[in-house]
From Swiss-Prot:
SMART domains cross-referenced by the UniProt entry: Ribosomal_S4, S4
Family: Belongs to the universal ribosomal protein uS4 family.
Keyword Ribonucleoprotein: yes
Domain of life: Bacteria
General function of this protein: One of the primary rRNA binding proteins, it binds directly to 16S rRNA where it nucleates assembly of the body of the 30S subunit.
Protein name according to UniProt: Small ribosomal subunit protein uS4
Gene Ontology process terms (BP): ribosomal small subunit biogenesis; translation
UniProt keyword annotations, A-Z: Ribonucleoprotein, Ribosomal protein, RNA-binding, rRNA-binding
Description of how the protein assembles with itself and partners: Part of the 30S ribosomal subunit. Contacts protein S5. The interaction surface between S4 and S5 is involved in control of translational fidelity.
Pfam families associated with the record: Ribosomal_S4 (PF00163), S4 (PF01479)
GO molecular function: rRNA binding; structural constituent of ribosome
Ranges of residues in domain S4 RNA-binding: 91-168
This protein's GO CC annotations: small ribosomal subunit
Amino acid sequence: MVIQRKYRASRRLGVSLWGRSKDPFNTRNYPPGQHGNMGYKKPSDFGKQFGAHKKFKFYYAISSKQMRNMFLKAYKKKGDTGDNFVGLLESMLSSVLYNSGLVPTIFSARQLISHKHVLVNGKVVNISSYSVKPGDTIKLREKAVNLPPVLAAIDAQEQKVPDYLEVDVKERSVKYLRVPKYYEVPYPANMEVNLVIEFYSR
């Protein structure tokens, strides 16, 4: 299964990235591969930085190039670089939709967006990295509200909806209230943004 392959990231990094019950890491908490059951090696300082970078990359399902561009943008902004960086990541359309709990995974969020099933303030947006602004309302289109993944996500209620989102399950919509700080994001895994900053500052 495609989703199972994507969840391999959790086993490679040694942590349940998305905190989902179907995550193979919950039952096989060792690296994938022939010699995986030998366990995880203690990483070097660079290894820790690279691992932290990978966690964010996989968690948000973005490319290394997108990650770097977002970091550079965050670095140039006034304020705390870590907060700026996480704020940019959490403001992506795919992140807002996933965090709403209306979809089961970040991957399904990106798929619904690319298939033009998502509206932002009443208009179709099919770019997952689209930057949502405070006050924007994201809604699933009529033909998507009863799709199996959507119904399953709502029924499972595995996603902890953060305080900076206002979700209307009945309307299949979510309002983005404000850009969060790093400490406000309810990551299911230990996400060390300070190590990401160190990684890009080498």
